[in-house]
């Protein structure tokens, strides 16, 4: 029986990059938990900013460099940088380290798998048809230049008694090709019938490796 591997972990160092760049044998567990806390804190605080990924880099034990990839940088930066300054100061108090925050704008959110998954989840939570939400996401991604996209939803779809999963695929999705640039994202929609899981794969072409 075939086993599926995470599309990002499969390509680390080739066409994908690490979300955490540091190594510390002594404080590994502490730093790992801190990284997760940082990501949850920023995602929850700026839920409507369209945050896709948060990278954490630690040049030394006293500094944390955070890079936030977002579709709406203005929400995090704020007027004259007031919001990002407030965020930096809050993180410095929370973790007792010097924090540097960099913001990277996502130019085409339609090609970001995490944002696409969260968009579908949001539509389902607002009682939109899951099929319409999936097809619209696929259409937008292909129109913006994706070479392939797969969207899968699983759960009590449409309030059905028995949970099932459905998926749509458009274009190519070479999951076994290492140099293929495949973006992957997941999200959860909370409905009155239970949770619905969403997975999105987007193929953007091949990396030069």
From Swiss-Prot:
Any one Pfam family match given in the protein's UniProt record, by short name: KH_2
Record domain KH type-2: where: 38-107
An example Gene Ontology biological process: translation
InterPro entries from the UniProt entry: KH_dom (IPR004087), KH_dom-like_a/b (IPR015946), KH_dom_type_2 (IPR004044), KH_sf_prok-type (IPR009019), Ribosomal_S3_C_sf (IPR036419), Ribosomal_uS3_bac-typ (IPR005704), Ribosomal_uS3_C (IPR001351), Ribosomal_uS3_CS (IPR018280)
Described function: Binds the lower part of the 30S subunit head. Binds mRNA in the 70S ribosome, positioning it for translation.
Family: Belongs to the universal ribosomal protein uS3 family.
Official protein name in the record: Small ribosomal subunit protein uS3
Organism name: Thermotoga sp. (strain RQ2)
Lineage per the UniProt record: Bacteria, Thermotogati, Thermotogota, Thermotogae, Thermotogales
């Amino acid at each position: 029986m075939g086993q599926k591997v995470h599309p990002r972990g499969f390509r680390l160092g080739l066409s994908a990059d690490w979300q955490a760049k540091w190594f510390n044998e002594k404080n590994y567990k502490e730093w790992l938990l801190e990284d997760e806390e940082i990501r949850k804190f920023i995602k929850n605080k700026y839920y409507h900013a369209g945050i896709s990924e948060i990278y954490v880099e630690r040049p030394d034990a006293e500094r944390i460099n955070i890079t936030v990839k977002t579709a709406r940088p203005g929400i995090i930066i704020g007027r004259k940088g007031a919001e990002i300054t407030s965020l930096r100061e809050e993180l410095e108090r929370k973790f007792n380290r010097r924090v540097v925050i960099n913001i990277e704008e996502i130019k085409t959110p339609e090609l970001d798998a995490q944002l696409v998954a969260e968009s579908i989840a949001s539509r389902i939570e607002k009682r939109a048809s899951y099929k319409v939400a999936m097809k619209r996401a696929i259409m937008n991604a292909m129109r913006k230049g994706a070479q392939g996209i797969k969207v899968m939803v699983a759960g009590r779809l449409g309030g059905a008694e028995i949970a099932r999963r459905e998926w749509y695929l458009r274009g190519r999705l070479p999951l076994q090709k290492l140099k293929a640039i495949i973006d992957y994202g997941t999200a959860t929609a909370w409905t009155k019938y239970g949770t619905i899981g969403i997975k999105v794969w987007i193929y953007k072409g091949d990396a030069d490796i």
